[in-house]
Amino acid sequence: MVEDIIIVSTPYVPGYKITKTYGFTWGLIVRSRGIGGNIIASLRTIFGGEIHEYTELLNQSRQYALDRMKQHAREMGANAVVSVGFDSSDIGQNMSEVLAFGTAVTVEPETAASSPVRLG
C-alpha cells in the first residue's frame, strides 16, 4: 500500500488548501474470475443471494486500483487525490476491470489566518 496520500471523494480536503494541481491520476486492474469461481458462482445464481466469491474479488480489485492510483499520484509529486471515484466493467465473460480515478494535488494544512470565519 502507498501510505501518506490523502484520498477524498470531495473536490477539497477539509482543513487543507490545495497549493498545486497535477491533473488526472488513475489506477487500473483487470482480473480474471477463474473457472472455479465461475462454477461456484453459477451454482449460487440458481439459488439466489450474494455471490461472495465475486464480492471478494471486486473488493480486492478496488483496493489494488486505489493503491495504483496513489502510486501514480505520488510519482506525479502529489500528496493527495481529490474527487476520487471508481468505475468497473466486464471484459468478455471472465474478466472484470476496475478503475480508480481522481485529481492529483498537493495540499497544505490551513492556517488560522487562511481559514474562513464561520458564524453561528
UniProtKB/Swiss-Prot annotation:
Gene3D superfamilies: Hypothetical protein apc22750. Chain B. Pfam families: YbjQ_1. It comes from the Archaea. Belongs to the UPF0145 family. This is UPF0145 protein UNCMA_30400. It comes from Methanocella arvoryzae (strain DSM 22066 / NBRC 105507 / MRE50).
